[in-house]
């Protein structure tokens, strides 16, 4: 039996964003539970699980899209961490953001670089902690 869209999406979300992605979905349960379900089913169950691009490529496209939209700090935070989770280097994330500069301008790129810096610093702090 084929997995449901929600099951496929939940697996993809966990693989990419770990606890951060689930925290976003959980934060919507009290006010807009359908929105959380749509994110899991559509974005992660239908789109992220398609053939043609691997998870690293999908995260780069997502980061570029979020940079162009502007005012997406929470989403950029989750997806930059997701990019690291699926094996992209910090340098690749920075290059993807810099690639947006000629098309969306310096203010949005600077803002995104600052989000990346915060995620990278947190990632470094987490990796310095002893593992249980």
Task: Give a label for each model feature.
Residues 72-92, 108-119:
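Extended intrinsically disordered, low-complexity coil regions enriched in Ser, Thr, Gly, Ala
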Residues 1-56, 85, 109-132:
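Acidic, glycine/proline-rich low-complexity segments that act as flexible tails and inter-domain linkers
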Residues 65-72, 105:
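Short alpha-helix boundary/capping elements
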Residues 58-66, 96-97:
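Short, structured motif recognition centered on aromatic/hydrophobic residues
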Residues 12, 43, 78-79, 96:
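A general alpha-helix detector
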């Amino acid at each position: 039996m084929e997995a449901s869209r929600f099951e496929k999406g939940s697996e993809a979300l966990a693989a990419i964003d770990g606890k951060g992605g689930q925290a976003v979905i959980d934060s919507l349960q009290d006010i807009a539970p359908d929105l959380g379900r749509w994110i899991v089913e559509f974005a992660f169950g239908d789109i992220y699980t398609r053939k043609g691009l691997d998870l690293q490529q999908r995260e780069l496209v997502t980061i570029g899209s979020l940079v162009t939209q502007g005012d997406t700090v929470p989403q950029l935070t989750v997806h930059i961490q997701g990019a690291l989770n699926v094996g992209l280097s910090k340098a690749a994330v920075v290059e993807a953001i810099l690639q947006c500069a000629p098309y969306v301008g310096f203010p949005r790129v600077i803002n995104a670089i600052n989000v990346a810096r915060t995620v990278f610093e947190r990632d470094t702090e987490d990796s310095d902690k002893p593992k249980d």
